[in-house]
Amino acid sequence: QTKQQQEGNTLWLKEGEPSVETMLELFAQYDLNVINELVFCGFGEPLERLEDVCRGIDSLKETYPNLKVRLNTIGLANLIHGRDVTPELKGRFDTVSISLNAPDEKEFLELTRSKFGIQSYEAIKEFAVLSKQYVPNVVMTVVEKVMPEEKIQKCQEICDTLGVTLRVRPFEN
């Protein structure tokens, strides 16, 4: 499908945060056997609602046991919840994709304005490392054309050190 075709066939939230029941009702309108991957993402952090996301995935996997699920995250869930939540990802997510966004903590904080301050950058890297224990695929991402090549190379070095894949996402208007 083209991006234009997808716009009319989307689960983008238009009005507030749905309950788990509403989310499952929306998913029930689709045959999830024909999709490659279900992605939890958004403007914000999907794991703000960790329990709801887990309940929803558990329910969906009862019907679709082979459903592939990806989490797109900023990687701050452990700071949000004040504990290590990565064990709860096991068996639920096949991929965790963390927005690295920057080659250093200062630039990351300038870009994200995280309420957790300068510790956020180390926290996302730790989240990546911890996630590897529970999730088969852990990647960190940056956006091409937004970042010069030398900064992308620095991000690659960070990912190499962490033992995760760097994915350079295409810039989309």
Predicted regions and their residues:
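Canonical Radical SAM [4Fe-4S] cluster-binding loop centered on the CxxxCxxC motif
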Residues: 1-18
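Sparse, context-dependent recognition of short Cys/His-centered cofactor- or disulfide-binding micro-motifs
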Residues: 8, 23, 31-32, 81, ...
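Glycine/small-residue-rich loop that forms an oxyanion/phosphate-binding "nest" at active or ligand-binding sites
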Residues: 19-21, 25-35, 39-41
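Conserved AdoMet/S-adenosylmethionine-binding subsite of the radical SAM
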Residues: 28, 37, 43-173
